[in-house]
């Protein structure tokens, strides 16, 4: 019988660790937290030092029973949850719930799941760090107070089922403020001027850009006219050596950003894949602020570079953490075995591991050495100059392995752009000059990676909170990830060639964006309400200062109860005051004007199922009319005219095959109705302008698709149909589907054959349901 019980957080980790320890050790998993604050209750005793009231969830009770039984049998219980604050709290909850004693309990931590790391942890146990536990407890209690106190105010003032949170609401604020910046942005016109010139000996022309933007078409035309007979010569020539240094090893946030840019992963996806890599023993702990690498890792990296690339590619480097309150772990994210260039696993795991491996190796590699040539080209009779630049990689250094990406990938840093051999004073011949109309770009919307970077810059949240925060604001429909179509402009192109200026036009779109975070109407309204009535909670500095206070608690400098008390005494009265405040209109409601036909008030607001327009007053005897906003319309900028058009629906288009054809808008968008058939109206057509012919075309297409889908019906049993589906032919009967055996000809089946298949399926033994136990999410 094993004398030692080791408890880790996840079953995958348990399996890996069990391989390293002998028969004297039994490894079990707690599947994350074994107890938490009660879900539906406030669960904080305000009268007694804000003591949290914990419960063991129903789905954890059997597990706790098993852990208690095994702990009783063991001589020593090793609590091996993660070393961050969340992991420390899990260890403390296990200690409390299992009724452990200091004599038989040891706390161990490790940053990688390797045999040497596990054995070292066993040799160097410690006690539970109660200060770290208190810091986690303070975060949990404060977030519960904010959520439980603010959410009912939102239900009362805006609509039911809304929620607020200390970090999530500030993240939404960032996205809303960026959207408002974009809305208020006024694009300014300018002309970008580029020349192609050549020397007598060069095979390729030199591309040079004018050193200033021209403000208008008139200025561009005047400039090109002056260049018709101008002389172009090299007025200055500089050659400078450049060095590029590698980026630091990955922290949680930089891994999330780089995986988003290079691999297209979401922040949550990155953390999920990294968790699997860690639990399989492939990488070190993935929640960390640190850029430090252990001396053992540095030694193996040096050996790897020297062996595979040679000594000239190696350069020892030490990196220092600059993040505020870095505390999550003591080492950066790196491969556990540097010699493992590749791993087995899923495609996602392989790609993320490859990214981590290359970044880690690059951190200890030599600088890339480049040579940058800049040529200034004077224009006879003008003050402006053309500038040509060329960059040549003399020694690739770390670029041999890895190049860090940026949010703006317009310049390819790895490109090798050479200039021909030039001399100062040399005259150049002109091939052509292009003056292209351009417009200044609006600020970009946040991608997930950009939002993580911004939150980290502001000191909001910690490595364990970035992914859950971004998931939460999307799950609660405050923010959606999507694309925005830009503004179309007719671009003027002016070309000077062979002494003549030619003008052409082309259409370009500015501001197109994909996979960006966009606030919903509900998100905008909730943000504006919280900004007006709870500015302290929404203040970036407040949220960052709270994180610092948690750090002080973790370091034992302050008592967690005192910090909570200081906050609650100011916050709670403010909540009560705002909750009781009488508002003239529901928050987010906006009066647009009066309907000229009826004289009734027209307003827009957030309804139970989303944004809508209202015709008539709620207080009047006559029931008001409601219409949902269409995709692309917003509570903040819909006009009276646009709102009134929504009340034109449903609209009768005419008759087709003896039945009326109408168009209307439902919860899922605009649709055409013909008898019992409903057909969605595509984005290319508007429900306000769709014609009968266009609607009939949609009806015919759907009828044709239905015809192909329908294999057979039975007059004696109208509810029974044989249908074609994406996974093959099947029987549909009373809202249930039944698979047709492969050896049966579906078209030849009789009603009795179908009944026999249904009866056989009903009598077949039920397959046991697979239950997947999940680790509790860290908050």
What does each model-found stretch correspond to?
Residues 258, 262-269:
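A conserved hydrophobic secondary-structure block that centers on an alpha-helix together
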Residues 241-250, 263-265, 436-445, 722:
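Short basic-aromatic helix/loop recognition motifs at nucleic-acid
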Residues 113-195, 239-243:
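C-terminal or mid-to-C-terminal helical accessory/interaction module adjacent to the motor/catalytic core
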Residues 53, 81-83, 101-106, 125-133, ...:
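Short, polar/flexible loop-turn hinges at active-site or ligand-entry regions and domain interfaces
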Residues 214-249, 256, 423-427, 434-436, ...:
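Metal- or metallocofactor-binding catalytic centers and their adjacent structured scaffolds
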Residues 1-140, 149, 211, 317, ...:
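Intrinsically disordered, low-complexity regulatory segments
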Residues 2-5, 16, 25, 151, ...:
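Basic, low-complexity terminal or inter-domain segments flanking catalytic cores
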């Amino acid at each position: 019988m094993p004398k030692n019980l080791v408890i880790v957080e996840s079953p995958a980790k348990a399996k890996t660790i069990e391989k390293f320890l002998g028969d004297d050790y039994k490894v079990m998993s707690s599947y994350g937290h074994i107890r938490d604050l009660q879900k539906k209750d406030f669960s904080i005793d305000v009268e007694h030092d804000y003591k949290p009231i914990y419960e063991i969830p129903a789905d954890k009770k059997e597990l706790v029973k098993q852990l208690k039984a095994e702990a009783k049998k063991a001589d020593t219980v090793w609590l091996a949850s993660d070393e961050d604050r969340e992991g420390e709290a899990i260890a403390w909850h296990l200690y409390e719930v299992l009724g452990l004693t200091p004599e038989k309990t040891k706390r161990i931590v490790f940053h990688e799941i390797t045999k040497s790391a596990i054995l070292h942890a066993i040799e160097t146990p410690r006690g539970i760090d109660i200060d770290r536990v208190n810091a986690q407890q303070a975060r949990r209690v404060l977030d519960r107070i904010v959520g439980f106190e603010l959410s009912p105010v939102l239900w009362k003032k805006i609509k039911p089922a809304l929620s607020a949170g200390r970090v999530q609401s500030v993240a939404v604020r960032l996205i809303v403020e960026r959207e408002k910046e974009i809305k208020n942005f006024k694009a300014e016109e300018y002309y970008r001027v580029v020349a192609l010139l050549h020397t007598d000996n060069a095979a390729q022309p030199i591309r040079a850009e004018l050193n200033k933007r021209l403000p208008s078409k008139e200025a561009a035309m005047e400039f090109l006219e002056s260049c018709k007979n101008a002389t172009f010569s090299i007025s200055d020539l500089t050659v400078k050596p450049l060095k590029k240094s590698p980026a630091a090893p990955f922290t949680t946030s930089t891994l999330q950003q780089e995986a988003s840019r290079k691999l297209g992963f979401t922040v949550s996806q990155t953390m999920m894949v990294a968790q699997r890599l860690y639990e399989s023993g492939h990488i070190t702990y993935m929640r960390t602020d640190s850029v430090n690498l252990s001396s053992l890792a540095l030694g193996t990296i040096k050996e790897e570079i020297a062996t595979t690339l040679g000594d000239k590619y190696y350069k020892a480097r030490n990196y220092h953490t600059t993040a505020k309150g870095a505390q999550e772990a003591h080492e950066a994210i790196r491969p556990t075995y540097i010699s493992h260039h590749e791993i087995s696993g899923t495609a996602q795991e392989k790609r993320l591991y490859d990214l981590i491996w290359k970044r880690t190796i690059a951190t200890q590699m030599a600088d890339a050495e480049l040579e940058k040539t800049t040529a200034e080209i004077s224009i006879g009779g003008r003050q402006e100059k053309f500038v040509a630049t060329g960059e040549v990689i003399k020694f690739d250094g770390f670029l041999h392995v890895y190049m860090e990406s940026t949010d703006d990938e317009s310049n390819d840093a790895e490109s090798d752009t050479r200039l021909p051999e030039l001399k100062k004073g040399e005259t150049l011949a002109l091939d052509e000059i292009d003056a292209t109309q351009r417009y200044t770009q609006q600020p970009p919307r946040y991608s997930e990676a950009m939002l993580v970077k911004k939150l980290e810059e502001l000191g909001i949240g910690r490595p364990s909170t970035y992914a859950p925060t971004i998931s939460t604001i999307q799950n609660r429909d405050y923010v959606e990830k999507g694309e925005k179509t830009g503004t179309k402009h007719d671009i003027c192109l002016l070309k000077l060639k062979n002494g003549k200026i030619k003008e052409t036009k082309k259409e370009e779109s500015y501001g197109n964006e994909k996979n960006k975070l966009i606030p919903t109407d509900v998100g905008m309204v909730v943000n504006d309400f919280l900004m007006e009535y709870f500015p302290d909670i929404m203040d970036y500095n407040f949220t960052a200062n709270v994180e610092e206070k948690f750090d002080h608690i973790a370091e034992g400098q302050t008592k967690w109860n005192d910090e909570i008390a200081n906050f609650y005494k100011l916050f709670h009265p403010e909540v009560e005051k705002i909750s009781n405040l009488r508002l003239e209109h529901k928050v987010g409601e906006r009066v647009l004007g009066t309907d000229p036909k009826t004289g009734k008030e027209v307003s827009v607001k957030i309804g139970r199922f989303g944004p809508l327009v209202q015709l008539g007053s709620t207080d009047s005897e006559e029931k008001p009319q409601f219409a949902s906003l269409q995709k692309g319309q917003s509570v903040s900028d819909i006009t009276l005219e646009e709102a009134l058009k929504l009340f034109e629906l449903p609209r009768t288009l005419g008759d087709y095959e003896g039945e009326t054809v109408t168009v209307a808008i439902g919860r899922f968008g605009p649709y055409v109705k013909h008898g019992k058939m409903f057909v969605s109206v595509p984005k290319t057509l508007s429900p306000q302008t769709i014609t009968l012919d266009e609607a009939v075309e949609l009806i015919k297409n759907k009828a044709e698709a239905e015809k192909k889908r329908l294999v057979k019906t039975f007059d004696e049993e109208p509810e029974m149909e044989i249908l074609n589906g994406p996974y093959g032919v099947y029987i549909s009967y009373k809202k249930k589907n039944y698979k047709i055996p492969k050896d049966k000809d579906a078209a030849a089946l009789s009603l009795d054959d179908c009944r026999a298949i249904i009866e056989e399926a009903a009598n077949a033994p039920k397959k046991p349901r697979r239950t997947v136990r999940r680790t509790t999410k860290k908050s």
